[in-house]
């Protein structure tokens, strides 16, 4: 069977990539006024479809990290990968530009500089490469 990725755009800079039973979620945000439609939101039922979820937070701005992501670990196996500029006490594996993390035999992540705060991420999952630029300031 041919491998495939399922990419879902949410809002602002947020999107997810599913590869088999792994879900990668980048800069998830419901919106300043919760404008992400209910039918597009990641729910506990969504998370339970995957054996592992990785949540990436590129930097500390509120529009790149909805607090709801920190409740997901109550219902699913979630690992957080966060920029080194996140406040002390933020849950997760911290990454600065130049860092590489091997999170499983199926997922490796490299952090690169951003044109604004934080980092950008290059994730290699199941042989596919996915780049998330983080915040763009140009």
What are these regions (language model features)?
Residues 1-20:
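N-terminal pre-catalytic "stem/leader" segment of glycosyltransferase-like enzymes
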Residues 6, 22-23, 108, 127-129:
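Residues that mark the start of a beta-strand
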Residues 16-56, 67-71, 136-138:
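Pre-active-site segment of Zn-dependent metallo-hydrolases
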Residues 10, 97-121:
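A metal-dependent hydrolase metal-coordination microenvironment
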Residues 17-20, 103-104, 123-126:
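Active-site beta-strand termini and strand-to-loop segments that position acidic
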Residues 41-102:
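Active-site HxH/HxHxD metal-binding segment of metal-dependent hydrolases
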Residues 114-138:
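Active-site-proximal loop/helix segments of hydrolase catalytic cores
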